[in-house]
């Protein structure tokens, strides 16, 4: 699993700025809502970070339990929560131990790929299966692996503005043999420079189908965009819907 210390107190403000820009938010809500209602439903948001997706789900009427291993991330979430119906829980989402079950489970912005080994991914999917209500669904928001594979072994960098006075440069290096992607985020202001990174191991759709079956789940839908476009060879997103077998 990705090291939660990556998102420590020194980097958390920068991480929150980047997450607010990159996380799908409204797009995630639109996609989930096209498969399951959210208003009045319970949602387990795994790997919630500083709460960007959790807040969007709550604003759609869901009661959200937001789980993350990074205490600084959850502290930031709690500062920004206001009156949204979001409960923050610190924990490793490979080992879920809630007494309750949920209508919806979400993992946004490649959180599923932060489980590094296949065994970790299967353990994570088993935890999801245990915590889904009958008729519930889990939603894995993933970049299509072809996007990573096109990079080869060469580093690629893209710079985005963060408001009026900061910018972030995202540098990614892909290891196609190991199915790994290293993303380095460099947030720059006039007098500040903050860096953090994420190490992810992607899985193909065929691998997700197999791991899901092992874990007691099945893939019941795959979309190519948050707007529900079909998943094709040209899709940049791989949005996977899972249900209990």
Swiss-Prot record:
CDD domains listed in its UniProt record: AdoMet_MTases
Keyword Flavoprotein appears in the UniProt entry: no
Keyword presence, Mitochondrion: no
Enzymatic reactions: N-terminal L-alanyl-[cypemycin] + 2 S-adenosyl-L-methionine = N-terminal N,N-dimethyl-L-alanyl-[cypemycin] + 2 S-adenosyl-L-homocysteine + 3 H(+)
Pfam families xref list: Methyltransf_25
GO biological process, one term: methylation
Superkingdom as given in the UniProt entry: Bacteria
Enzyme class: transferase
Enzyme Commission identifier(s): 2.1.1.301
Gene3D superfamilies: Vaccinia Virus protein VP39
UniProt keyword list: Methyltransferase, S-adenosyl-L-methionine, Transferase
One MF term in the entry's GO annotations: N-methyltransferase activity
InterPro entries membership: Methyltransf_25, Methyltransf_Superfamily, SAM-dependent_MTases_sf
Function recorded in the entry: Involved in the biosynthesis of the lanaridin cypemycin. The enzyme can methylate a variety of oligopeptides, cyclic peptides and the epsilon-amino group of lysine.
Family assignment from sequence similarity: Belongs to the methyltransferase superfamily.
UniProt-recorded name of the protein: Cypemycin N-terminal methyltransferase
Organism the protein comes from: Streptomyces sp
High-level lineage: Bacteria, Bacillati, Actinomycetota, Actinomycetes, Kitasatosporales
Gene: cypM
């Amino acid at each position: 699993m990705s090291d939660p210390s990556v998102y420590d107190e020194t980097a958390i403000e920068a991480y929150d700025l980047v997450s607010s820009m990159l996380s799908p938010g409204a797009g995630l809500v639109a996609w989930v809502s096209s498969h399951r209602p959210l208003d009045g439903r319970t949602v387990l948001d795994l790997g919630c970070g500083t709460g960007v997706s959790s807040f969007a789900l709550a604003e759609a009427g869901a009661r959200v339990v937001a789980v993350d291993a990074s205490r600084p991330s959850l502290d930031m979430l709690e500062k920004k929560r206001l009156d949204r119906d979001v409960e923050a829980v610190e924990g490793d989402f490979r080992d879920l131990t809630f007494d309750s079950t949920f209508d919806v489970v979400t993992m946004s912005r490649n959180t599923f790929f932060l489980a590094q080994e296949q065994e970790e991914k299967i353990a994570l999917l088993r935890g999801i299966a245990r915590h889904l209500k009958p008729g519930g669904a889990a939603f894995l928001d993933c970049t299509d692996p072809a996007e990573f594979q096109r990079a080869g072994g060469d580093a690629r960098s893209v710079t985005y503005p963060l408001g009026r006075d900061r910018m972030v440069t995202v540098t990614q290096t892909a290891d196609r043999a190991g199915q790994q992607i290293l993303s380095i985020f460099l947030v720059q202001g006039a007098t500040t420079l903050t860096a953090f990174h994420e190490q992810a191991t992607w899985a193909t759709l065929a691998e997700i189908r197999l791991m899901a079956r092992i874990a007691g789940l099945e893939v019941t839908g795959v979309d190519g965009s948050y707007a529900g476009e079909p998943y094709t060879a040209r899709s940049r997103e791989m949005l996977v819907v899972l249900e209990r077998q």
